[in-house]
Amino acid sequence: MSSIRVGIVGASGYSGEELIRLLVRHPGVDLRWITSRQYKDRTLQSVYPGIGRFGELEFDDLESLEKKENQLELVFLALPHGAGMDYAHFFYNRGKVVIDLSADFRLENPLDYELYYKLSHPHADLLKKAVYALPEIYPDQIAHSNLLAMPGCYPTAVLLSLAPFLKKGWIDPHSIEIVALSGSTGAGKTLDTKLLFSELADNLRPYSFPSHRHIPEMEQQIAKLVKTDSVKVIFLPILAPLRRGILLTVIGSLSQPISQAEAEEQAQEFYKEAPFVKILPGGIMPELRYVLYSNNLYFSIHVLEEKKKLLILAAIDNLGKGAAGQAIQVMNIRLGWAQTLGLIP
């Protein structure tokens, strides 16, 4: 098969590292450019021994941007929120496919971005051109866009868990409550006392409640799924003593009586062509070990008929389906390749 020339901007963060791990085994990728100020001029194999393909490729810095852009067809941006906006604008305006793993182009309203991320968006005109790149929900839009905004890790799990039932009108979209346990890599490579081993071990720490940054993203997309102006969700994230992985519970009020069998059948039908979404049957519940180092999402459905509630348990790897793995799935869709290429051995 023909290959595409790829660059990674921000290749030394956790998402960037995961992108490298996955892309070196992707048969359609010719990795041409990786950036990291920390590792500048070092080879890929000197930083990640045993990496295999592209081991002699050297980390570069962004000062070489103008020289390198002609060598690239597709660019992953794996920078912290706010740091990659100008690079997205630069590459997009030069006809490159841009896949941005940050939150910079997820929110349609620049005022929401300013409120939750404390930054004024310098390229707000691009927000209308960006596609929210959740593969199982928006594959057609992904296939025709050059600016692809990757969903956050929590919203990925929440939206994929709820979508089959929201689209049917079975859940009141204003009743949704979420509690999630997450590993520490979700915070990035931040120098923060709260992320030290001795602070994480033997501990669970709720954080960013009640106004986590992923809330407007969830609310925006839930409103789109049910075709209403706005919804409000309650979201409690909890930092767990784990490197990676998310296990979450979603609860919503049923808007009509449904059976357990109907709920499972609806989910199976909704995701019948989704290779990475796995619905667990018969009361089996997801565990983190099912999803680590994969692009899979596992979830179980529990209809609480007497309480008129639907409870969903879901598990993903925040660096896999929550970040780098899903970004490669999106690349595959955009290029007309099988979604699973490079993601399933």
Curated annotation (Swiss-Prot):
Molecular function per GO: N-acetyl-gamma-glutamyl-phosphate reductase activity; NAD binding; NADP+ binding
Catalytic activity: N-acetyl-L-glutamate 5-semialdehyde + phosphate + NADP(+) = N-acetyl-L-glutamyl 5-phosphate + NADPH + H(+)
InterPro entries from the UniProt entry: AGPR_AS, AGPR_type-1, NAD(P)-bd_dom_sf, NAGSA_dehydrogenase, Semialdehyde_DH_NAD-bd
GO biological process annotation, one example: L-arginine biosynthetic process
Location relative to the cell: Cytoplasm
Keyword line: Amino-acid biosynthesis, Arginine biosynthesis, Cytoplasm, NADP, Oxidoreductase
Enzyme Commission code(s) on record: 1.2.1.38
GO cellular component: cytoplasm
Residues annotated as catalytic: C153
Family, similarity comment: Belongs to the NAGSA dehydrogenase family. Type 1 subfamily.
Protein name listed in UniProt: N-acetyl-gamma-glutamyl-phosphate reductase
Natural source organism: Methylacidiphilum infernorum (isolate V4) (Methylokorus infernorum (strain V4))
